[in-house]
From Swiss-Prot:
Protein known as: Apolipoprotein A-I
Annotated GO biological process: adrenal gland development; amyloid-beta formation; blood vessel endothelial cell migration; cellular response to lipoprotein particle stimulus; cholesterol biosynthetic process; cholesterol efflux; cholesterol homeostasis; cholesterol import
Subcellular compartments: Secreted
Organism taxonomic ancestry: Eukaryota, Metazoa, Chordata, Craniata, Vertebrata
Residue positions, PTM Methionine sulfoxide: M110
InterPro entries membership: ApoA_E (IPR000074), Apolipoprotein_A1/A4/E (IPR050163)
Main localization category: secreted
GO molecular function terms noted in the UniProt entry: amyloid-beta binding; apolipoprotein A-I receptor binding; chemorepellent activity; cholesterol binding; cholesterol transfer activity; enzyme binding; heat shock protein binding; high-density lipoprotein particle binding
Length: 267
């Protein structure tokens, strides 16, 4: 229970910097590294799920009848996309490094604000943890007689046990909801304070002069433009790699349609 409450605190205050237990000895990731890892996981999941759908279609009766060899084309497409990712790796890394460098001061200020707000809300989180542990203990005490009855065979039907448990479960749910609502109310001012601090930081940047904002905009545009220019060769390679795949799919599809038309005409 304590771990669950601490997890809630970490999620609320630090943006979920928790790692898997086998990664605890690794150096902490930067926010940009986490964003890049998340994007990679998303792309890989889409790629894997897409291949599963293609495989399921080819295994179906219609897929076997058409014989489009979609899985071979999908694997070729995947290889081409993977090559694109490898080619763009250094370019995107440079973009992330530049962006992280330009926004470093703002992240440092916000980290300080987060630590201050975290210190203020910690007593409320500790109080919530204490009350929740008390509720669990109380619920366990109320369940003990029912557990004893059930073990001794006094309750012959599971329905009887469910009828006795339902009021207790509803009571615990209502009390838990009340504690969560109280915690939400207590934390609301600090959430507003954090948003206000961020707005203040941005306002300071704005009031520091139009030249500063224009400079950041120009740098961002420059980085994006450089990313686009450096990505052109890799994108052209992707286009060239896709052409044989698309042509193969086109030929297979037209051949399948022609074969299907012949079967219809012969019937």
């Amino acid at each position: 229970m304590k771990a669950a409450v601490l997890t809630l605190a970490v999620l609320f205050l630090t943006g979920s910097q928790a790692r898997h237990f086998w990664q605890q000895d690794e150096p902490p990731q930067s926010p940009w590294d986490r964003v890049k890892d998340l994007a990679t996981v998303y792309v890989d999941s889409v790629k894997d799920s897409g291949r599963d759908y293609v495989s399921q279609f080819e295994s179906s009766a219609l897929g076997k009848q058409l014989n489009l060899k979609l899985l071979d084309n999908w694997d070729s497409l995947t290889s081409t996309v993977n090559k694109l990712r490898e080619d763009l790796g250094p370019v995107t890394q440079e973009f992330w490094d530049n962006l992280e460098k330009e926004t470093g001061w703002l992240r440092q200020e916000m980290s300080k604000d987060l630590e201050e707000v975290k210190a203020k809300v910690q007593p409320y989180l500790d109080d919530f943890q204490k009350k929740w542990q008390e509720e669990v203990k109380l619920y366990s005490q109320k369940l003990e007689p029912l557990r004893t009855e059930f073990q001794e065979g006094a309750l012959q039907k599971l329905q009887d046990l469910q009828e006795k448990l339902s009021p207790l479960a509803e009571q615990v749910r209502d009390r838990a909801r009340a504690h969560v609502d109280t915690l939400r109310t207590q934390l609301a001012p600090y959430s507003d304070e954090l948003r206000q601090r961020l707005a203040t930081r941005l306002e300071v940047l704005k009031e520091s002069g139009g030249a500063s904002l224009a400079e950041y905009h120009a740098k961002a545009s420059e980085h994006l433009s450089a990313l686009g220019e450096k990505a052109k060769p890799a994108l052209e390679d992707l286009r060239q790699g896709l052409l044989p795949v698309l042509e193969s799919f086109k030929v297979s599809f037209l051949s399948a349609l022609e074969e299907y038309a012949k079967k219809l005409s012969s019937q």
